[in-house]
Amino acid sequence: RYADDFKLFCRDYSTAKKTMMATKLWLQENLHLETSDEKSGVTNLRKNYTTFLGIKFKVVPSGKKWIVRSHMADKSKEKVIVKLKNVWKDIKNPSLQSRLNENISLYNAMVMGMHNYYCMATMVSKDFAEISYKVVGKSNGMNHNNRCNNIEKSGEISSEHINKKYGKSKQFRWINGRMIVPVGYVAHEFPKYKRRSVNKYLRKHDDIGNCISFEIMEYMM
């Protein structure tokens, strides 16, 4: 797939209209690419949200400045809820207890992956608090079903990476000795760009440690 989504930011409406027309002409004349009128347009970020790669954002006043406020996009949030609910149901399902460890590993991997991506949104903590309520609720309800393993509020955090990232959370739970990564425990992190020095044309590319967290890889395996 090609990365064909982009946003251009301008200070006023007239400049934005001119920039959009110039961009359309440039893409058509130089790259022979047609733009979609339905997906292209000008948005006033002081009044409305715009969505980009699963994140919706606008600007809000803060003192004498305007700052970005961003959330998970509505469609993205619904997809996350559906995916996590399906795995959580399998964890609770008495007939699937033989696959409990597999399902818990899948659930934890999904939660950590979603946190790693959506943490760039400034309001990600609020968004995942809502997701947590809809997916696991109070979670202790599982304890009323004697055929399921009880959810415990204390246990051992076996992964150093998870302990470093989630260890302070009071939302941690354990099932049959396996820890459940708290879906509602995430904070905003400023997005970082990939260093230009890390690419396949330079020797530094051989240092795979620049790109991959071995702690995460070890836990996933």
Where are these regions (language model features)?
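Non-catalytic terminal/accessory segments
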Residues: R1-M221
